[in-house]
Amino acid sequence: MAPRLLLLLLAFLRLGTTGPLVQGRGFRSPTVAWPSFFNFNQPQGVQETIQIPNNGSAPLLVDVQVFVSNVFNVDILRYTVSSMLLLRLSWVDTRLAWNASLYPQHAVTLPWDSLWTPGLTIQEALWVDWQDQSPRARVGPDGHVDLYLALTTETNCDFELLHFPRDQSDCNLSFYALSNTVLELEFRAHAVNEIVSVKREYVVWGLETQIPPRQLVPCFQVTLRLQNTALKAIIALLVPGEALLLADMCGGLLPLRATERIAYKVTLLLGYLVFHSSLVQALPSSSSCNPLLIYYFTVLLLLLFISTMETVLLAALQARGHLSARSSPIPTPRGEQQDHGDLGPHPEEAPGVKESRSWAEAADHIFFLVYVVGVVCSQFFFIGFWMWATCKSDPAPGEAIPHGGQPRL
């Protein structure tokens, strides 16, 4: 009883002082600047001296409220997402309770390192930045403890990019209490969406929490459901690609014998090659379930290549037939040989030249019709495939083998 009275007396005296006041038996002074339960750089030799509160035969129940205030820096090329969270941890520690009739204090605040706190680790975190380096816990007369932790973290996320730029992905933040077992500690988690800004490329349209089953250590998981607004990708990727394809079809209306047609087609092909090289760097890639846009733009490249090759081949065949017809002599009556030089600057073409030209133009016209029909059909086919296509990602290495991932029962 004496240590508890000494603890309460020191807690009440803190109202008139500025330093860390709650010290005594069973408490320790701060040893690191950051909270130990998220400090990845803390030496392994540092051991907790305060034991978890005893809740009898049942595990200690810690109620967790996760307030998500911002999600930003969604990088699909690095498969990372940054978020700002506020954690509210609540539990009951009867060792900190006092008689409210003798000490009429509604609540006291204690340093985080003066009492037991659950040691949490974010499994997917690359780094964690704390807004408050010295959080304080609020303790009620019944031993009810409230601890608020504000943090900014960057985590890994397995984006589902098959339908990019209209993709929807679930990003998980898994919190593990590795210093306790499920027989000692149990979490009950809730999530609240407090995001007020919608001016983002990726917006959070859903927020869920769950307790993963069959775990050896206590844990809870927060799932952020992200959806791409797609406006940037449509303007930067789809519009230029469709414009080049439409320009290529319009180029088929130029006469085959016009020298500008070959230059026009080659210029479009070279321009699309430059666009395609930058496109490959802008689109994400994955070991499985790559974006459908990668295949779509590859098909567009093949269509432009086929259209350019058709123009070059038919123009070459037409020119070769024209030269062969010019080189062969045309038999004419002797009386008409004197008048051959009076035909003017545009003499009548040889029959072989007309035949080769008409054959090439007919083939070009047929190819143009087939090409237009093929392009239109490919667009409808891709739209249907986009709507109905599904892809299941390959299992992660930690799930494919029995000994991988977190320990399971």
Curated annotation (Swiss-Prot):
Signal sequence, start to end: 1-18
One annotated GO biological process: monoatomic ion transmembrane transport
Side of membrane Extracellular, spans: 19-233, 287-296, 387-409
Segments passing through the bilayer: 234-254, 266-286, 297-317, 366-386
Post-translational modification as stated in the protein's UniProt record: Glycosylated.
Role noted for this protein: Ligand-gated cation channel that allows the movement of sodium and potassium monoatomic cations across cell membranes when activated by zinc (Zn2+), copper (Cu2+), and changes in pH. Could also transport cesium.
Name the record gives this protein: Ligand-gated cation channel ZACN
Organism: Canis lupus familiaris
